[in-house]
Design a protein with these regions (language model features):
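Short aromatic/hydrophobic "clamp" motif used to bind/position activated sugar donors
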Residues: 90
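A conserved acidic beta->alpha catalytic loop
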Residues: 41-51
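Catalytic core of nucleotide-sugar-dependent glycosyltransferases
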Residues: 213-222, 228-257, 275, 281-304
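Short, well-formed alpha-helical segments that are part of the catalytic scaffolds
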Residues: 14-28
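Membrane-interface aromatic/basic loop that binds lipid-linked glycans or pyrophosphate carriers
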Residues: 282-344
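Cell-envelope/extracellular polymer assembly enzymes that use nucleotide-activated donors
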Residues: 4-6, 36, 196
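Glycine-rich, basic loop-to-helix element that forms the pyrophosphate-binding segment
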Residues: 69-85
Length: 344
């Protein structure tokens, strides 16, 4: 049976919550034989994640594939799932997250329609929901006023994204061939590589479809979660690493043909640089500001126009104000935005 979609689930010591993730996919899709789940055990050694992965494959050998690798980090686990995917489409679901049953059925039905009609769609965008455990609230992210709904379209047909709207990994289902053609070079043992995943392949995407359904449920609230403010601050060097990879992927103004895609990618990269600026200021590392200065210097040398846009645009100016007062204003602005948008 040809597989319509592969859901990749990277797992690292995920025994406490991975079953919910797998169940949400299998139950949501009705255990359909054209749906595949690839569970990647990323060298888990502190719990029974490897055994759970193998048990899922034993129970559903035609639907679930368990893959084991030495610990390499989230990015390598995602790409291991891509390498083992049999589906025409691929979607990553982190092991502490889950999918909505009705929405994931709609996604699979939509993908089947493309394959049956022979219509080549490179990327499907769907909505996602931040599930905040601390106050049992939800923050819904959709693209209704940005992307045409219910039709195949190209980058030039999309509108202007708000600061709260970005095509993150949670929103994306790639055609597997496109994702493999991107040849993503994910750094080992590095967090926040989902930004690379949701950036580097985009110029290879020629056709898109927006499914207005809340497919992905993104859990927020674990103390060790990578988007937790304290954790992110302690791992700011990971963001520096990711920013450099994104920087060197393209000379955005020269390499990206579509004006709309060029604008989107430059805005997204600017946000990544802003995150580096904000959390470098929050970091207790004695070299944090020197490292940030080095990052900005690298960008200026690589592409002066990208540097000017990222550093001297509104977002760049607001997140790089000089002196103690500038730092206070920057961090105060971040915390206000965090309360309003609730992105971590």
């Amino acid at each position: 049976m040809n597989k319509t979609i592969t859901f990749g689930i990277p797992c690292y010591n995920s025994a406490d919550y991975m079953d919910h993730c797998v169940e949400s996919i299998l139950e949501g899709t009705g255990y359909a034989d054209d749906v595949q789940v690839v569970i990647v055990d990323d060298g888990s050694a502190k719990d029974d994640t490897p055994q759970k992965a193998d048990e899922w494959q034993r129970r559903y050998p035609d639907l679930v594939k368990a893959v084991h690798q030495e610990n390499g980090g989230h990015g390598l686990a995602v790409m291991k799932a891509v390498a083992n995917a049999d589906g025409a489409y691929f979607k990553n679901i982190d092991s502490d997250d889950w999918v909505d049953a009705d929405a994931v059925r709609a996604l699979v039905t939509t993908l089947r329609g493309f394959l049956e009609s022979g219509q080549q769609v490179d990327m499907v965008v769907s909505n996602y929901v931040y599930e905040h455990v601390e106050d049992d609230s939800q923050n819904y992210v959709n693209f209704r006023r940005v992307l045409p709904c219910g039709k195949v379209f190209g980058w030039n047909e999309m509108g202007h994204f708000k600061m709260t709207q970005y095509l993150l990994m949670h929103a994306i289902t790639y055609r597997t061939e496109v994702l493999r053609a991107a040849n993503l070079q994910m750094p080992a043992h590095t967090f926040y590589v989902d930004n690379i995943y949701a950036y580097v392949p985009f110029p290879l995407v020629k056709t898109l479809y927006y499914l207005d359904a809340d497919v992905y449920r993104y859990f927020i609230g674990r103390d060790d979660q990578s988007v937790n403010e304290k954790v992110l601050t302690s791992r700011i060097d990971h963001y520096w690493r990711v920013a450099r990879i994104m920087m060197r992927a393209y000379h955005v103004y020269d390499d990206i043909e579509s004006p709309q895609l060029r604008s989107y990618m430059m805005n997204y990269f600017t946000i990544i640089m802003a995150i580096c600026s904000v959390f470098s200021r929050m970091s207790e590392r004695p070299d944090a500001m020197d490292q940030l200065d080095s990052l900005w210097a690298d960008l200026k040398a690589y592409d002066p126009r990208m540097y000017r846009r990222a550093k001297h645009g509104v977002v760049g100016l607001a997140t790089n104000l000089p002196g103690p007062v500038g730092k206070w204003i920057t961090l105060s602005g971040y915390r206000v935005a965090r309360r309003v948008v609730k992105f971590n």
